[in-house]
Amino acid sequence: MKRTTILMAAFLCLFSLTESPAQNTHKNMELLNLTQEWDKTFPKSDKVNHSKVTFVNRYGITLAADLYAPKTIFGGKLPAIAVSGPFGAVKEQSSGLYAQTLAERGFLTIAFDPSFTGESGGQPRSVASPDINTEDFSAAVDYLATRPDVDAERIGIIGICGW
Protein backbone atom coordinates (compact mmCIF):
# COMPACT_ATOMS: atom_id res chain seq x y z
CA MET A 1 0.00 0.00 0.00
CA LYS A 2 2.75 2.43 0.99
CA ARG A 3 4.75 1.52 -2.12
CA THR A 4 1.68 2.12 -4.32
CA THR A 5 1.11 5.52 -2.73
CA ILE A 6 4.74 6.53 -3.30
CA LEU A 7 4.62 5.38 -6.93
CA MET A 8 1.37 7.24 -7.50
CA ALA A 9 2.79 10.42 -5.94
CA ALA A 10 5.93 10.15 -8.09
CA PHE A 11 3.81 9.68 -11.21
CA LEU A 12 1.65 12.71 -10.39
CA CYS A 13 4.73 14.87 -9.75
CA LEU A 14 6.28 13.82 -13.04
CA PHE A 15 3.02 14.37 -14.93
CA SER A 16 2.54 17.85 -13.45
CA LEU A 17 6.05 18.90 -14.54
CA THR A 18 5.42 18.17 -18.21
CA GLU A 19 3.73 20.64 -20.53
CA SER A 20 1.14 20.08 -23.19
CA PRO A 21 2.03 21.16 -26.75
CA ALA A 22 -0.36 24.11 -26.42
CA GLN A 23 1.42 25.35 -23.29
CA ASN A 24 4.78 24.97 -24.98
CA THR A 25 3.98 26.81 -28.24
CA HIS A 26 5.98 29.96 -27.56
CA LYS A 27 8.93 28.12 -25.99
CA ASN A 28 9.36 26.14 -29.21
CA MET A 29 8.85 29.17 -31.43
CA GLU A 30 11.31 28.96 -34.28
CA LEU A 31 13.97 31.62 -34.38
CA LEU A 32 13.82 32.94 -37.91
CA ASN A 33 16.65 34.65 -39.75
CA LEU A 34 14.85 37.75 -41.05
CA THR A 35 16.40 39.99 -43.68
CA GLN A 36 16.40 43.58 -42.43
CA GLU A 37 17.40 45.46 -45.59
CA TRP A 38 14.91 46.28 -48.36
CA ASP A 39 14.74 43.12 -50.47
CA LYS A 40 11.49 43.58 -52.37
CA THR A 41 10.84 43.36 -56.12
CA PHE A 42 9.24 46.83 -56.00
CA PRO A 43 10.50 50.27 -54.89
CA LYS A 44 10.11 51.36 -51.26
CA SER A 45 7.42 53.99 -50.68
CA ASP A 46 8.29 57.19 -48.84
CA LYS A 47 4.69 57.34 -47.52
CA VAL A 48 4.93 54.13 -45.48
CA ASN A 49 6.87 52.81 -42.48
CA HIS A 50 8.08 49.24 -42.92
CA SER A 51 9.14 46.71 -40.28
CA LYS A 52 9.45 42.95 -39.83
CA VAL A 53 7.12 41.05 -37.49
CA THR A 54 6.54 37.40 -36.60
CA PHE A 55 3.58 35.49 -35.20
CA VAL A 56 2.74 31.84 -34.59
CA ASN A 57 -0.11 29.82 -36.08
CA ARG A 58 -2.00 27.16 -34.13
CA TYR A 59 0.34 24.46 -35.48
CA GLY A 60 3.25 26.19 -33.75
CA ILE A 61 4.81 27.39 -37.02
CA THR A 62 6.39 30.84 -36.82
CA LEU A 63 5.39 33.07 -39.72
CA ALA A 64 7.44 36.00 -41.01
CA ALA A 65 5.70 39.14 -42.21
CA ASP A 66 6.42 42.63 -43.47
CA LEU A 67 4.32 45.23 -41.68
CA TYR A 68 3.43 48.42 -43.56
CA ALA A 69 1.94 51.41 -41.74
CA PRO A 70 1.06 54.81 -43.16
CA LYS A 71 3.48 57.52 -42.03
CA THR A 72 0.58 59.93 -41.68
CA ILE A 73 -2.11 58.74 -39.29
CA PHE A 74 -5.12 60.92 -38.57
CA GLY A 75 -5.95 59.71 -35.05
CA GLY A 76 -7.60 56.57 -33.86
CA LYS A 77 -7.02 52.96 -34.71
CA LEU A 78 -6.43 51.85 -38.28
CA PRO A 79 -8.28 49.32 -40.38
CA ALA A 80 -5.95 46.44 -41.21
CA ILE A 81 -5.46 43.90 -43.98
CA ALA A 82 -3.43 40.67 -44.10
CA VAL A 83 -2.11 39.80 -47.57
CA SER A 84 -0.53 36.64 -48.95
CA GLY A 85 0.41 35.75 -52.49
CA PRO A 86 -0.19 32.77 -54.74
CA PHE A 87 0.97 29.34 -53.58
CA GLY A 88 4.76 29.33 -53.56
CA ALA A 89 5.09 33.12 -53.71
CA VAL A 90 6.85 35.18 -51.04
CA LYS A 91 6.03 38.51 -49.40
CA GLU A 92 8.80 40.30 -51.30
CA GLN A 93 6.70 39.96 -54.47
CA SER A 94 3.09 40.87 -55.30
CA SER A 95 1.66 40.51 -51.78
CA GLY A 96 4.19 43.04 -50.48
CA LEU A 97 3.33 45.47 -53.27
CA TYR A 98 -0.39 45.13 -52.48
CA ALA A 99 0.29 45.63 -48.77
CA GLN A 100 2.47 48.71 -49.32
CA THR A 101 -0.06 50.28 -51.72
CA LEU A 102 -2.90 49.71 -49.24
CA ALA A 103 -0.80 51.25 -46.44
CA GLU A 104 -0.32 54.34 -48.63
CA ARG A 105 -4.13 54.56 -48.62
CA GLY A 106 -4.47 54.44 -44.82
CA PHE A 107 -4.52 50.74 -43.89
CA LEU A 108 -2.09 48.98 -41.58
CA THR A 109 -1.10 45.89 -43.53
CA ILE A 110 1.01 42.78 -43.27
CA ALA A 111 2.28 40.69 -46.15
CA PHE A 112 3.33 37.29 -44.86
CA ASP A 113 5.11 34.19 -46.10
CA PRO A 114 2.86 31.15 -45.60
CA SER A 115 4.11 28.16 -43.63
CA PHE A 116 6.98 26.26 -45.30
CA THR A 117 7.77 29.23 -47.58
CA GLY A 118 10.24 32.11 -47.68
CA GLU A 119 11.35 33.37 -44.27
CA SER A 120 8.54 31.55 -42.41
CA GLY A 121 9.18 28.32 -40.57
CA GLY A 122 7.88 24.82 -41.03
CA GLN A 123 9.09 21.57 -42.55
CA PRO A 124 9.25 20.35 -45.27
CA ARG A 125 10.23 23.46 -47.20
CA SER A 126 8.67 24.86 -50.37
CA VAL A 127 5.35 23.06 -50.20
CA ALA A 128 1.83 24.47 -50.24
CA SER A 129 -0.89 23.23 -47.93
CA PRO A 130 -4.26 24.94 -48.46
CA ASP A 131 -5.47 23.85 -45.00
CA ILE A 132 -2.42 25.19 -43.19
CA ASN A 133 -2.30 28.31 -45.38
CA THR A 134 -5.89 29.03 -44.36
CA GLU A 135 -4.79 28.73 -40.72
CA ASP A 136 -1.93 31.13 -41.54
CA PHE A 137 -4.49 33.76 -42.55
CA SER A 138 -6.40 33.17 -39.32
CA ALA A 139 -3.18 33.63 -37.32
CA ALA A 140 -2.41 36.84 -39.25
CA VAL A 141 -5.85 38.25 -38.40
CA ASP A 142 -5.38 37.24 -34.75
CA TYR A 143 -1.99 38.98 -34.72
CA LEU A 144 -3.43 42.17 -36.21
CA ALA A 145 -6.31 42.14 -33.69
CA THR A 146 -3.81 42.20 -30.80
CA ARG A 147 -2.08 45.35 -32.02
CA PRO A 148 -3.03 48.56 -30.16
CA ASP A 149 -2.98 50.57 -33.41
CA VAL A 150 -5.52 48.32 -35.19
CA ASP A 151 -9.32 48.48 -35.06
CA ALA A 152 -10.11 44.79 -34.46
CA GLU A 153 -13.59 45.26 -35.97
CA ARG A 154 -12.09 46.32 -39.31
CA ILE A 155 -9.65 43.60 -40.36
CA GLY A 156 -9.73 42.03 -43.81
CA ILE A 157 -7.67 39.62 -45.87
CA ILE A 158 -6.50 39.46 -49.47
CA GLY A 159 -5.38 36.21 -51.04
CA ILE A 160 -3.79 36.81 -54.42
CA CYS A 161 -4.40 34.08 -57.02
CA GLY A 162 -4.75 30.50 -55.84
CA TRP A 163 -6.76 31.44 -52.74
Residue ranges of each PLM-predicted region?
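Short beta-strand element of the alpha/beta-hydrolase
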Residues: G76-P86
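The serine-hydrolase catalytic nucleophile loop
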Residues: G88-Q100, P114
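Glycine-rich "HGGG/HGxG" loop immediately N-terminal to the catalytic nucleophile
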Residues: Q93, F116-A128
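Conserved alpha/beta-hydrolase
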Residues: T101-G121
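Alpha/beta-hydrolase active-site loop
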Residues: V127-P148
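Alpha/beta-hydrolase fold nucleophile elbow
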Residues: D149-C161
